[in-house]
Regions:
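Short tryptophan-centered beta-strand motifs in secreted/extracellular beta-sheet-rich domains
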Residues: 187-196, 204, 248
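Extracellular, beta-strand-rich glycan-interacting domains
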Residues: 130-140, 238-264, 275-285
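Bacterial Sec-dependent N-terminal signal peptides
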Residues: 2-8, 13-47, 95-107
Length: 309
């Protein structure tokens, strides 16, 4: 009987030791998560967001703060060692991603699912006149249409696109009216400009030289249709397979002389007639404000690659 009593005491003591060890493990896991939260909060307070190289990309602090808030939720609502450990891993990864999102030189690669959404085309006042200027480089030519920028919606809108190995500019004036370049090469940068003037026609330029023009009627647009770069808003298979940089939209028609001078794409954001300009030469994440400071776009599934050496 005495032996049985001693065994029961030993078993109870062992259970207390095990529980004590578990409490200690929980405490260590919880302390680790608290330290990680403090590290994340310090990262936010001591960093600077901005559009200059070396800054943290705009929007990064909000993303990290969301992870911090979630970690606090775990602290306040869980007593599980496993939950603390998982939260620590996720927050630690978020801190690493935060610092990896430093603004640096980059080139946006567009592909299936990629887009740069400029919002409703009705906000851009393009029915009287406009110009589009950009640089493009293709890593693949597709048999169908590849939209550089488009607000095509049924039988309305306009599009700067490639079809096969030529670039085309089309508007809908009741019918589709357009012009195109000669054949392009893969893996080479081209400067492209397209203009529209109500009653004055359309024109297309390649590397500063006019390569096509056509008379046209009045442009028809659906005001609430999205203006998107890298794809067509209404057709997911009409996506760009390559790179876009130095995208600018103008309220007026750029003259042949201006287009030739635009090749360097060195716009300050204060030029007369300039609606918006995105250099797209720095990895600024998924939300980018243009040089005028008036327009912010959202990028989806765009891959930022290192610039060419």
């Amino acid at each position: 009987m005495r032996t049985k009593y001693i065994s029961m005491i030993f078993l109870a003591s062992l259970m207390l030791i095990c529980l004590s060890c578990k409490d200690e493990d929980d405490s260590l896991a919880r302390s680790g998560l608290i330290e990680c939260i403090q590290k994340a909060e310090t990262s936010i307070s001591e960093s600077v967001e901005g559009n200059e190289e070396g800054c943290i990309a705009p929007g990064s602090k909000d993303i990290l703060q969301t992870r911090i808030d979630w970690a606090y939720f775990i602290l306040q609502n869980s007593s599980s060692d496993e939950a603390y450990t998982n939260a620590l891993k996720i927050l630690d990864d978020a801190i690493a991603a935060f610092y990896a999102n430093t603004v640096k030189a980059g080139v946006p690669l567009f592909g299936l699912g990629s887009k740069m959404n400029l919002g409703p085309v009705g906000d851009w006042n393009v029915t009287e006149s406009f110009s589009i200027v950009c640089r493009v480089k293709y890593n693949e030519f597709a048999g169908g249409d590849q939209n550089v920028i488009s607000c095509e919606s049924g039988n309305s809108g306009w599009m700067l696109r490639s079809s096969g190995n030529v670039i085309q500019f089309y508007i809908n004036d009741g019918n589709w009216t357009g012009c195109q370049t000669s054949s392009l090469e893969l893996n080479r940068w081209y400067h492209v400009a397209a203009t529209y003037q109500k009653g004055g026609g359309i024109a297309l330029y390649l590397d500063g030289k006019k390569v096509g023009s056509s008379s046209c009627g009045t442009l028809q647009v659906t005001p609430n249709a999205d203006l998107q770069a890298g794809t067509a808003p209404s057709y997911s298979d009409r996506y760009m397979r390559g790179y876009i940089q130095d995208l600018s939209l103008w309220k007026d028609v750029r003259t042949a002389e201006e287009v030739a001078a635009d090749i360097n794409c060195d716009f300050s954001g204060t030029e007369d007639g300039l609606n918006a300009y995105w250099p797209l030469n720095l990895n600024l994440g998924t939300s980018i404000t243009d040089k005028t400071g008036n327009h912010t776009v959202n990028l989806v599934d765009v891959v930022w690659e290192d610039p060419e050496e």
